[in-house]
């Protein structure tokens, strides 16, 4: 999943990167694959707002994707986080995990039709999250 916020565990990209930055002893920052793989992330507050909107306005048995159309490469995500943390990094590429995807971007057209609007950009969400760690 690409929902992020505080206390979300360490199994996904953003919390894993935060953990790596906390324990970074050199400027080398490991990323899997080329770093050009893309994802879309949604801050937990926006996710909850979208879910509540679905409860109120979603069609029974309808399928809705909750997310954003804000796409970012894994390399640019790490760079954004390093800038916010004032850390200089040099990327060290590792093989991509078996079954890894090059791009993940949800089609959110249906949820937008019932009024969903992202309120917290990725950069703003990361700032909020990094204040808490």
Annotate the PLM regions.
Residues 1-14, 37-38:
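Flexible, glycine-rich beta-alpha linker
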Residues 11, 20-21:
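Mobile, glycine-enriched helix-loop/loop "lid" segments at the mouths of ligand-binding/catalytic clefts
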Residues 2-5, 19, 49:
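Active-site micro-motifs of SAM-dependent methyltransferase domains
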Residues 23-133:
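C-terminal substrate-binding subdomain of Rossmann-fold SDR/epimerase-dehydratase oxidoreductases
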């Amino acid at each position: 999943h690409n929902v992020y916020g505080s206390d979300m565990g360490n199994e996904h990209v953003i919390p894993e990167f935060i953990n790596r930055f906390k324990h970074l002893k050199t400027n080398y920052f490991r990323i899997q694959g080329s770093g050009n793989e893309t994802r879309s992330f949604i801050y937990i507050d926006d996710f909850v707002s979208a879910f509540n909107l679905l409860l109120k306005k979603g069609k029974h048995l309808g399928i809705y994707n909750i997310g954003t159309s804000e796409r970012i490469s894994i390399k640019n995500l790490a760079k954004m986080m390093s800038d916010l943390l004032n850390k200089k990094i040099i990327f060290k590429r590792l093989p991509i995990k078996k079954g890894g995807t090059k791009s993940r971007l949800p089609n959110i057209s249906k949820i937008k039709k019932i009024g969903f609007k992202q309120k917290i950009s990725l950069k703003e969400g990361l700032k909020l999250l990094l204040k808490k760690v």
